[in-house]
Amino acid sequence: MALLEICCYSMECALTAQQNGADRVELCAAPKEGGLTPSLGVLKSVRQRVTIPVHPIIRPRGGDFCYSDGEFAAILEDVRTVRELGFPGLVTGVLDVDGNVDMPRMEKIMAAAGPLAVTFHRAFDMCANPLYTLNNLAELGIARVLTSGQKSDALQGLSKIMELIAHRDAPIIMAGAGVRAENLHHFLDAGVLEVHSSAGAWQASPMRYRNQGLSMSSDAHADEYSRYIVDGAAVAEMKGIIERHQAK
C-alpha cells in the first residue's frame, strides 16, 4: 500500500496528521519559504509526543541549495542533533554551482546521519540532469527522493516521476507538490509508492486586536494574521483513497 507522508509545521499539526492516518511526518518550519529547519524546542516536543516516524527537514534558509561554508557547518550540526534526538530519518539536499549534487558535502551529511534514512528533498527538482543526479543519490545511499518531476506541481511532472521510478536501482521516488485528494488517484494508478502532501489550509489567527498599519515581514502585503495548519479531514480522506485503491 502506498505510504502517505504529511508535511507539518508544528507539533500540533504532526499530532493531527498522526491521528488521521498519516504514515510519516516531514517536520518543517516556515511554510512560506518552502520549509526550513525546525527549532530545537519543536524537535524535542514532537519527539516526545508523536509516535509515527518523523523526518525533520535540514535546510538553513530559503532560496537555492548551494550553501556557504557557514551554512553547511550549521547543516551538519543540525543533522547530528536530529540523530542524537533519536529521529529515524531526515530530509535535506545540497547542490553545487552547476546544479549537480554536491557529492563531497552530501558524503559528509551521510556520514553524520549514520543509520538515519535520508530523503533528498526538492533540491532534486532544481538539478541540471535528473537521471545523472539519481545515480549519484543511489551511490550515496539516499533512501528516497522527494520530487515534483521538475515541474511546478507533481501532476504536471508525473511522466518524469514515472521515468524516475523505472530507473534501475533508484531510491524510492516520493511524489510531492500539489498532491491532494482530488488528484491522488493519478499517482496511485501510476505506481507511485510514496506520496507527500501538506494536506493543509490557512487558518485565521485568533487575535482580536490587529495593528493593520504595521508588518513584521519584509513583504508588506503578507498576511500575518493567518497560519498554515494540517487539515485532519484532508489527511483522512487521502488515507481512505489509498486504502480503497489497495483493496481493488
Curated annotation (Swiss-Prot):
Keyword Cytoplasm included in the entry's annotation: yes
Q: What GO molecular-function term can you cite, just one?
A: copper ion binding
* Domain of life according to the entry: Bacteria
Entry GO CC = cytoplasm
Q: What is its main location?
A: cytoplasm
Localization per record: Cytoplasm
Q: Name one Pfam family in it.
A: CutC
List all disulphide bridges recorded for this chain: none
What are the entry keywords? Cytoplasm
In the record, the note on similarity to other proteins reads: Belongs to the CutC family.
Protein name, please?
A: PF03932 family protein CutC
Organism per entry: Escherichia coli (strain 55989 / EAEC)
Upper lineage is: Bacteria, Pseudomonadati, Pseudomonadota, Gammaproteobacteria, Enterobacterales
